[in-house]
Each structure stands twice: as C-alpha cells, then as structure tokens.
Amino acid sequence: ALMITGYAGTGKTTAVKALINTLYDFKINTVLMAPTGRAAKVLSSYTRKPAFTIHKKIYRQKSAKDGLGDFVLEKNLHHRTFFIVDEASMISNQSFDMSVFGSGRLLDDLIEYVYQNASCKLILIGDTAQLPPVKMDLSPALNPGQLEGYGFTVKRSFLSDILRQTRESGILYNATSIRKMIDQDESGYPKLAVSEFSDIDTVLGADLVEAISDAYDQYGIEETVIITRSNKRANQFNQGIRNQILWREEELATRSEERR
C-alpha cells in the first residue's frame, strides 16, 4: 500500500492528478473513492474522473431471501487496478453494533475488498492534521504501523512544503502557524494574522447577520460554513440563522409529533 499524506496546500491534489494520468498512460486502471459523498464529489471534480463513496463501491445489499437491509462485502472483479482513496483520515476501524455494513469496521472491509485480487493496489491519501474518526486518537488509515498489521509493506510519501497560496491566503497562513504550534507543543492561544490578507475580513457582531446573509446569497448555503468552538455556540448560531436569516421561526417537530 502507498500512503500519501500532507497538509493543506502541499500539493496532494496535483500529485493525485499526475498519478492518475501516469497510470492511464501505462494502461493501468484506477478506481477513485472517498469516505463521504461530498468528498467523492470533490475528488471527481478535480480529477475529472468518476469517484464513489467507499460504501457504494465495496458493499452490496443482500437479497430478500438473505434478509433485506444488511450489506455484505462485494466481490472485487477488478484486475490490475489501483484503488485511490482520498480523505482517508476519516476512515474508521471502530466496530459499531448497529452497523448494517459488512463487519462494521470500514478499514478492515476496504482492505479485504481491494486485496481479494492480488493484482490490485491501494493508495491512501489524507491530511494527518485533520481530526481522526470519532472516539479515536489517531486515524487508523493513516497510521503506517496499523496498516502493516494487515501483513503488507506500507510506503509513505509525506508532503510538507506549503506550495499553494503561501503568501496570498491568510487562512492557509494561520492554519500553518497553528499546526506548527501543535507540532512544537507550544502552550497558549494562537495569534491570528488578519489585517495582512485579502481573503480575511474582520466582522463585528452587529454586522454578522448581514455578512452571513450576503454569503448565502453570493455562494449558497452549502458553500458557507460557520465554525465555532463548542456545540452550545453552534446550536445558538443555528437557531439564530433559522430565525433571523432563513425566517423559520417555528420549532422543529419530531416525526411522532407530525403524526398527531
């Protein structure tokens, strides 16, 4: 297996595009996958190739006689194929009792599916600075030691130099500064640089509603993200957006209430 890791702006996207084109030139097939539908859509957009969610590709639903609802591991019918998985940091190996997908351990199932055919290879791409799956300290899919436990050799390529928007992007500049603090175990709160960059605007509280509304109008709700430090604050923001921007003041009703 090959693991390609790197922080934002280090060229992972460019490397993946070049890799896919090179494999195509050598007449080697590729299958692109990602853990979520959104990640698969992004992967497909920048490679201009079809991309699937991992679940859609590796599982199939049981027939009615076997018990409709559960999904079992699909047979890998590909030959001499590279399976390229983006956003691999999100792949969990935590078993869930209520899971209807395979063993319930996605990483186990992914590796078993790919290596049903010895001519197939797996490439995992991701950012180790991103949060690991829920209830896990490290991302198992980007942990070389854990991957080697499956019995194969893991080659790793780590991209460390920021190549994209180093000077132009304040978001990338601040993210890199925070990451360096974490790597060096520095204590205290980070100091964010905001005035030197054109892609960062400081918004006063009194102007926040208008700023969010303008972003919704210009970019759309799906492309506007609000990040806050706690679930409590997130709930407050969501309620405020519903009431003051989307004009949905009614309370959310549960399905049981809707049936009354």
Predicted regions and their residues:
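Walker B catalytic acidic pair
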Residues: D86-A88, T128
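P-loop (Walker A) phosphate-binding loop of NTP-binding proteins
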Residues: Y7, P35, R229
